[in-house]
From Swiss-Prot:
It is an enzyme of class 7 (translocase). It is found in: Mitochondrion inner membrane. This is Iron-sulfur clusters transporter ATM1, mitochondrial. The keyword Translocase applies. It is a multi-pass membrane protein. CDD domains: ABC_6TM_ATM1_ABCB7.
């Protein structure tokens, strides 16, 4: 039998509704009281809520009653707590530059990381494709270099005196030369296109593997890492990084290697055909052109990095604003967020303007170098023709060979610029893969205990999300197998942290968590998480159908098992009312359904998962009383099996009064533990204090509801 400890304070409650607070609407006072009940602890926040309800005198009298040494409602012997100095909160200083302090990855390291995807160990099919693509590349460039030679031969062949005795039909030799010219040009293009087709599969496979491995790595990172990152920035970094891989691969195979090969061939031909002076001029031009391009591009790189940072920030602001659309509307902060988004876009605009201006400078410098060299070589060639050392065809050949380099050289500038940009984008992607996995299996993980459910034991566990602020402090307690255990306490005492530690979202800094005597850090991580089910306070749902969200509890479940879980969670009524039934989209984070329906969906998920250990993390605290009672009934019907260990983290003590064991936390340590009756039997226990506060607030809630009804009655009679 549950014992309800009553207090002789009813007159105080009635007297507390003083005339000075009658001006406060009853609905407002009732809402404040209900909010305080949901807090479930006697703290300063609750005191403010009560004052807003106009019942601060009751709260003070009740506190005096509970804190008195003799328990008779007086506070003569009550000790007065010393006043503590209130520290002022200092607003954060605005960022002055916004530059990232994170270390960069060298370009050589990035290329090395990428190379293993295009030349994978043990995958001969991919290697053969790469070799075929390189062979086609070389063939295309050799044919491309032959084009100016056929053009030269055609011009020299036609350098004859045409008269009436000369046949009107071109000689066969000239015809063959022209046809060879066309065939070489067509062959070079076809070889290039075949190279693209052969290498496309290699490039796309590399992109797929990098994206998949990055995603899998992100899924293995700890919860703390994800909570400290902005989702919008992460998705943008992955998107740009994969595009960067695509460009780097195409640039290397389709541009950088071909350009280098073609320049080498042209320099060799010029040296062999016309002497070292033409080759030296070409070589010096290439050096100057490349040096200017690389130096200028390196200078422009920081502008691009700055643009990326601003782009990430803008994406994060936009995504956060859209995800929290309701909150934006509640507080009328559309203009504030628009200004915030505008600031990020302005920084992106400024960086992009610098990128465009520096690009104009780069293009002008490149054209000046190349045009100067081409003019000088044309002068040298024309001089050779006038001296008789060269033919007109030779002059055309020199012009064609050098001018033919202008196309790849122009590509060299743009390719190098984009290559640097792509490497920056890939740097962000590969950085994600370099983040260390803190929560992982040991080299030889142990098997789970044979008998489930098993005992969960915390041994001197100390843990904090921040190094200088511990949430749990040397906590020691035991959760018995097959029993209902409740964990209660004031906000911030570490209740939800216990769930996160058992699930191994984090590892404790000190102490151990044991399952039947085995440290959970030594158990297989996937197996551990497979036997723990969670119904959280705010159920995370995907923007998908009800059916798919329930199925997420166990992907390989049969249709009958999913239907059974839906029926047990009492979702059938909702589904029958919806036009599309189980195919109804729940919306982003489940915003298209009510809080109670979201929790029932969460219950259906864990029913489908069917785990021997269950955690209910304040699963009903955000719901109204009627919905809460209905859900508690559903939970009791489905999770009362002795083969399951149920752990309830709760603020509302009425919901866990029937627990086999109640653990009371305060300031990160176990204050007391026992059954509901045993804890209430001790008038000085924290649990007794919390219980009495909530019980008397329930009384006040009932009185305010009655007063609200009386207030409505005269209005009804007047209408009649």
């Amino acid at each position: 039998m549950i014992m309800f400890r009553s207090l002789s304070v009813t007159p105080v409650w009635k007297a507390g509704l003083s005339l000075s607070h009658r001006s406060i609407p009853i609905n407002s006072r009732l809402s404040s009281v209900r909010n305080y009940i949901s807090i479930g602890c006697a703290n300063k926040t609750g005191s403010r809520l009560l004052r807003s309800a106009g019942v601060s005198s009751q709260y003070k009298d009740f506190r005096r009653f509970n804190s008195s040494s003799n328990g008779n409602g007086t506070d003569k012997n009550a000790s007065v707590a010393p006043k503590t100095e209130v520290k002022k909160i200092v607003p954060p200083k605005p960022s002055t530059n916004g530059k990232s302090k994170t270390p960069t990855i060298s370009e050589l390291r990035i290329m090395k990381d990428l190379f293993k995807y295009i030349w994978p160990s043990g995958d001969n099919k991919v290697k053969i494709r790469v070799l075929i693509a390189l062979a086609l590349l070389i063939g295309a460039k050799l044919l491309n270099v032959q084009v100016p030679f056929f053009f030269k031969q055609t011009i020299d062949s036609m350098n004859i005196e045409w008269g009436p005795d000369v046949a009107t039909v071109l000689p066969v030799a000239i015809t063959m030369t022209i046809l060879s010219y066309g065939a070489a040009r067509f062959g070079a293009v076809m070889f290039g296109e075949l190279r693209n087709a052969v290498f496309a599969k290699v490039a796309q496979n590399a992109i797929r593997k990098v994206s998949l491995q990055t995603f899998q790595h992100l899924m293995k990172l700890d919860l703390g890492w994800h909570l400290s990152r902005q989702t919008g920035g992460l998705t943008r970094a992955m998107d740009r990084g994969t595009k960067g891989i695509s460009y780097v691969l195409s640039a290397m195979v389709f541009h950088m290697i071909p350009i280098t090969f073609e320049i080498s061939v042209v320099c060799g031909i010029l040296t062999y055909q016309f002497g070292s002076s033409f080759a030296a001029m070409t070589f010096v031009t290439m050096l100057l052109y490349s040096f200017f391009t690389f130096k200028t591009t390196a200078w422009r790189t920081e502008f691009r990095r700055s643009a990326n940072r601003a782009d990430n920030k803008a994406a994060s602001v936009a995504l956060d604003s859209l995800i929290n659309f309701e909150a934006v509307k509640y507080f009328n902060n559309e203009e504030y967020l628009a200004n915030k988004y505008h600031q990020s876009l302005s920084k992106y605009r400024d960086s992009q303007i610098k990128v465009a201006q520096s690009l104009a400078f780069l293009n002008a410098g490149q054209n000046f170098i190349f045009t100067s060299a081409l003019t000088a070589m044309m002068y040298m060639g024309a001089s050779g023709v006038m001296e008789g050392a060269l033919t007109v065809g030779d002059l055309v050949l020199i012009n064609q060979l050098v001018f033919q380099l202008s196309v790849p050289l122009n590509f060299l500038g743009s390719v190098y610029r984009e290559l640097k940009q792509s490497l920056i984008d890939m740097e962000s992607l590969f950085k994600l893969q370099k983040n260390p996995i803190l929560i992982k299996n040991t080299e030889r993980p142990l098997m789970l205990p044979e008998h489930l459910p098993c005992e969960i034991k915390f041994e001197n566990v100390t843990f904090g999300y921040q190094p200088d602020r511990n949430i749990l402090k040397n906590a020691t307690f035991t959760i018995a197998p097959g029993k209902k255990t409740a964990i209660v306490g004031p906000s911030g005492s570490g209740k939800s942290t216990i769930l996160r530690l058992v699930f191994r979202f984090y590892d404790p800094q000190q102490g151990r968590i044991l399952l039947d005597g085995k440290d959970i850090r030594e158990l297989d991580l996937d197996e551990l998480r497979r036997i723990v089910g969670v119904v959280p306070q705010d159920t995370p749902l995907f923007n998908d159908t009800i059916w798919e969200n329930v199925k997420f509890g166990r992907i390989n479940a049969t249709d009958n098992e999913i239907v059974t879980a839906i029926e047990k969670a009492q979702l059938s009524d909702l589904i029958h009312k919806l036009p599309k039934g189980t195919e109804t989209i729940v919306g982003e984070r489940g915003l298209m359904i009510s809080g109670g329906e979201k929790q029932r969906l969460a219950i259906a998920r864990v029913l489908l998962k069917d785990t021997p250990i269950m955690f209910f993390d304040e699963a009903t605290s955000a719901l109204d009383t009627h919905t809460e009672q209905s859900l508690l009934k559903t939970i009791k019907e489905n999770f009362s099996d002795v083969a399951k260990t149920s752990v309830y983290i709760a603020h509302r003590l009425r919901t866990i009064a029937d627990a086999d064991k109640i653990i009371v936390l305060e300031n990160g340590a176990v204050r007391e533990e026992g059954t509901h009756n045993a804890l209430l039997a001790n008038p000085n226990s924290l649990y007794s204090e919390l219980w009495n506060i909530q019980e008397n607030l329930d009384m006040l809630e009932d009185e305010l509801e009655d007063e609200l009804k009386l207030e409505k009655e005269p209005r009804t009679s007047k209408k009649d």
